[in-house]
Design a protein with these regions (language model features):
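Rossmann-fold NAD(P)-binding glycine/threonine-rich loop
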Residues: 87-161
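Long, compositionally biased stretches enriched for glycine and/or charged residues
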Residues: 183-431
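N-terminal Rossmann-like dinucleotide-binding module
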Residues: 1-34
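N-terminal Rossmann-like NAD(P) cofactor-binding module of classical short-chain dehydrogenase/reductase
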Residues: 71-81
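Rossmann-fold dinucleotide-binding core
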Residues: 144-212
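Short acidic low-complexity segments
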Residues: 60-73
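Helix N-cap at the beta1-alpha1 junction of Rossmann-like dinucleotide-binding domains, i.e.
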Residues: 10, 36-40, 173
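Glycine-rich phosphate-binding loop and adjoining beta1-alpha1-beta2 segment
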Residues: 22-55
Length: 431
C-alpha cells in the first residue's frame, strides 16, 4: 500500500498520520511526502525512520521533491496544500479595502471560504489542484483522494470533476465556539452521553437532532438560542433556517450576505505559525536523534501528537482502502442520497458511515428553509470550482447567484473580481 502526501501543511500532520497508520491501523505501507527542501526532507525521513522502527512494521517514509516519484503507483493521495494563502489573502484584503469615504470598499467580502475573497481563494487553489490532478491522471489514475485543502467543498468538487473519488475533512463541527462540546455544556450534559445529528455543507453545518437516552434535547437548545444565550448570529439563523448552526458560526457567515454584527477576521490562520513550525521541527529532530523508544524521544512524540490538528485523514483512508467499517463526523463528499432533498451531485458535509468500505447514506432530512439556502450555496460552490478549472462563464454565473453578494451591485463585483484575477495572474492562468 502506498500513500502520497502532498501540500505544505502535511509536515504538521505527519505525527498523527503515522500514528494512525502504524499503531492504530497496524498497516505496513510506503509513505511518500512531496518536499522540495532538502533540510526538511532529512528532518521528516529521520523522524519517520524512528517512528517506523518503534512500530516494528515493514514500512518506509520517503521525502522527495519529484512529484512523479511521489505519486507513482499511489493507492491514496492525501492533499493538504494551498497557494501562499496568508500573503495572497492580505493582498486581496488590501485591494478590497477601498480608498476613502467615496470608495468604502468591500472589506466584509475578505473571507477565507465565501464571498469575493473565497472565490479568489478557490481560483488560486484550483490551479494547484488541477496541476496535481493532471499528474495523478498520469501516475496514479485510480488513487483515492483525502482532501484537506480549503475551501474544502470547492476543492473536493474539483477532484471529483477530474474523475477521482474524493472525501474531504475541514474544521470539525464538534469543536469551536458553537461546537457540539460547547452546546452540551450549555445543557449540563456530557458530550459522550448524547446522540447528535449534524449535517449541511462544509463550513455550513447545522445540528438537526440531539438526544440523550431517547429524550429530545433540541427544544431546550432552541429555547436557549431564542434567549440569546448562544449568540445573536445563532438566534438569527435559527429564525431563518429552523436549525442551530454548529461549529464556528463565523464560518457560516462567510457564505451569507454581510451582517452588521459580523466582521470577518482580518488575519485568519493559515496552517502553522513560524513559532509552531520551529517547535515542531525541534520535536521531530529529537525523535529522529533519540529514537521513539527513548524517554526524551517519547516525550517529544507526545508533544507532537498533543499539538497536531484534530482531523484524522489516515483513519478514513484506511477504512476506505481496506473495506472496513467506520463512522466519522463532518466528512465532505458527494451527496448521493445522504441529504435526499439536495441533488445527488451536491458536495455536502455530514456523518459518514462505512460498512465494509461502502458508504451507507443516512437519508437525513433538513428543514425546508435550510434546504433552500444549502441549495444556493452548493450551486455557488460548484460554479466556483468550475471557474477554477478554467470556465469563464461559470465565473460570471457564480458571481450572479452567490448569496454572499446579496444586496451588492453584481456588475461591480464582476469588475472587482476581474481586477483581482489580474492581480494574481502569476498563479491564476486558466481564465
Amino acid at each position: 500500500m502506498k500513500f502520497a502526501l502532498i501540500g505544505q501543511d502535511i509536515p504538521a500532520l505527519i505525527p498523527t498520520l503515522l500514528a494512525d497508520l502504524l499503531f492504530a491501523g497496524k498497516q505496513a505501507a510506503d509513505v511518500w511526502v512531496e518536499e522540495k527542501n532538502q533540510a526538511m526532507q532529512d528532518v521528516l525521513q529521520r523522524y519517520g525512520k524512528a517512528i517506523i522502527e518503534k512500530s516494528g512494521l515493514a514500512a518506509s517514509l520517503t521525502a522527495d521533491g519529484d512529484r512523479a516519484a511521489v505519486l507513482s503507483g499511489a493507492d491514496c493521495v492525501i492533499y493538504a496544500g494551498d497557494c501562499m494563502a496568508a500573503s495572497r489573502f492580505r493582498q486581496d484584503r488590501e485591494a478590497l479595502s477601498g480608498s476613502g469615504e467615496d470608495d468604502p470598499g468591500l472589506t466584509d467580502q475578505a473571507r477565507v471560504n465565501g464571498g469575493i475573497e473565497g472565490l479568489l481563494h478557490t481560483l488560486r487553489q484550483g490551479e494547484m489542484v488541477m496541476t496535481l490532478c493532471e499528474a495523478m491522471q498520469e501516475h496514479c489514475p485510480g488513487a483515492l483522494v483525502i482532501n484537506l485543502g480549503q475551501p474544502v467543498a470547492r476543492t473536493t468538487a474539483i477532484f471529483e470533476a477530474q474523475g477521482f473519488r474524493c472525501f474531504g475533512l475541514g474544521r470539525t463541527p464538534l469543536k469551536g465556539a458553537n461546537g457540539l462540546d460547547s452546546l452540551c455544556k450549555k445543557l449540563h450534559t456530557p458530550e459522550r452521553d448524547v446522540q447528535a445529528t449534524i449535517a449541511g455543507l462544509p463550513g455550513f453545518a447545522f445540528l438537526l437532532g440531539l438526544k440523550k437516552d431517547g429524550a429530545d434535547l433540541l427544544p431546550k437548545l432552541h429555547k436557549l438560542a431564542r434567549k440569546d444565550e448562544l449568540g445573536r448570529l445563532t438566534r438569527r439563523w435559527l429564525d431563518w433556517y429552523e436549525a442551530i448552526a454548529i461549529g464556528d458560526v463565523t464560518d457560516h457567515a462567510e457564505f451569507l450576505p454581510a451582517q452588521e454584527d459580523y466582521i470577518p477576521e482580518e488575519e485568519p490562520t493559515f496552517g502553522e505559525s513560524v513559532e509552531q513550525r520551529k517547535e515542531r521541527i525541534l520535536h521531530m529532530n529529537t525523535v529522529g536523534d533519540k529514537g521513539a523508544s527513548d524517554r526524551e524521544g517519547m516525550m517529544a512524540q507526545l508533544l507532537l501528537l498533543s499539538k497536531a490538528p484534530p482531523i484524522r485523514p489516515m483513519q478514513l483512508a484506511l477504512a476506505l482502502l481496506r473495506g472496513e467499517g467506520l463512522t466519522v463526523d463532518g466528512v465532505t463528499r458527494r451527496n448521493d442520497g445522504e441529504l435526499p432533498q439536495l441533488p445527488k451531485y451536491a458536495i455536502i458535509e455530514a456523518r459518514l458511515t462505512l460498512q465494509k468500505g461502502q458508504v451507507m447514506p443516512h437519508g437525513t432530512q433538513l428543514p425546508a428553509p435550510l434546504v433552500e439556502i444549502c441549495g444556493e450555496i452548493d450551486e455557488t460552490n460548484r460554479l466556483a470550482a468550475k471557474a477554477a478549472m478554467g470556465d469563464r462563464s461559470a465565473l460570471r454565473e457564480c458571481i450572479e447567484i452567490d448569496p454572499a453578494l446579496s444586496g451588492l451591485d453584481r456588475l461591480y463585483c464582476q469588475e472587482l473580481v476581474d481586477r483581482l484575477i489580474e492581480l494574481h495572474d502569476d498563479v491564476i492562468t486558466r481564465l
